[in-house]
Amino acid sequence: MRSKFKDEHPFEKRKAEAERIRQKYNDRIPVICEKVEKSDIATIDKKKYLVPADLTVGQFVYVIRKRIKLSPEKAIFIFVDEVLPPTAALMSSIYEEHKDEDGFLYITYSGENTFGEAL
């Protein structure tokens, strides 16, 4: 999936911002979180997150659920490189394995399991 954030910001600017963030907050991970285009789930109010390195994927999903005010009975799926990351995985390990060349970790979310494969 193409990232709107990447389309709106040139590579050099994104790379410089990610480097600045990592230097200033070395215990945090710069994350861009965007909705899967054709999903019927609510659109998130902000795309950029500074996530604690020791946060789990499950805890990050909880943050996203709160930001989009998703009711408990509704499902949400997050994807990294179009694959479902393990809920117990630390965001720091997902970042190290899947960070973009610009230094950000790109995560997409959907109300449906649109890709359907676990990491």
From Swiss-Prot:
UniProt cross-references to CDD domains, sorted A to Z:
Ubl_ATG8
Q: Which residue numbers mark the site Cleavage?
A: G116, E117
Listed InterPro entries: Atg8-like (IPR004241), Ubiquitin-like_domsf (IPR029071)
Propeptide residues, per UniProt? 117-119
What keywords would UniProt list here? Autophagy, Cytoplasmic vesicle, Lipoprotein, Membrane, Protein transport, Transport, Vacuole
* GO biological process per UniProt: autophagy; protein transport
Gene Ontology, cellular component aspect: autophagosome membrane; Cvt vesicle membrane
Positions of Phosphatidylethanolamine amidated glycine lipidation: G116
Subcellular location as annotated: Cytoplasmic vesicle, Cvt vesicle membrane; Cytoplasmic vesicle, Autophagosome membrane; Vacuole membrane
Chief localisation class: membrane
List where this protein forms a coiled coil. none
Query: Can the keyword Transport be found in this entry's annotation?
Result: yes
Fetch the Gene3D superfamilies from UniProt: Phosphatidylinositol 3-kinase Catalytic Subunit, Chain A, domain 1 (3.10.20.90)
Question: What is seen without this gene?
Answer: Leads to deficient autophagy. Impairs conidial germination under starvation conditions, conidial longevity, and ascospore maturation.
Instruction: Tell me if Lipoprotein is a UniProt keyword of this record.
Output: yes
For this protein, what post-translational modification is recorded in UniProt? The C-terminal Glu-117, Ala-118 and Leu-119 residues of ATG8 are removed by ATG4 to expose Gly-116 at the C-terminus. This Gly-116 forms then a thioester bond with ATG7 (E1-like activating enzyme) before being transferred to ATG3 (the specific E2 conjugating enzyme), in order to be finally amidated with phosphatidylethanolamine. This lipid modification anchors ATG8 to membranes and can be reversed by ATG4, releasing soluble ATG8.
What is the topology of this protein in the membrane according to its UniProt annotation?
A: Lipid-anchor
Q: Which family does it belong to?
A: Belongs to the ATG8 family.
Q: What does this protein do?
A: Ubiquitin-like modifier involved in cytoplasm to vacuole transport (Cvt) vesicles and autophagosome formation. With ATG4, mediates the delivery of the vesicles and autophagosomes to the vacuole via the microtubule cytoskeleton. Required for selective autophagic degradation of the nucleus (nucleophagy) as well as for mitophagy which contributes to regulate mitochondrial quantity and quality by eliminating the mitochondria to a basal level to fulfill cellular energy requirements and preventing excess ROS production.
Q: How does it assemble?
A: Conjugation to phosphatidylethanolamine (PE) leads to homodimerization. Interacts with ATG1, ATG3, ATG4, ATG7 and ATG12.
The name this protein goes by in its record: Autophagy-related protein 8
The organism is: Cochliobolus heterostrophus (strain C5 / ATCC 48332 / race O)
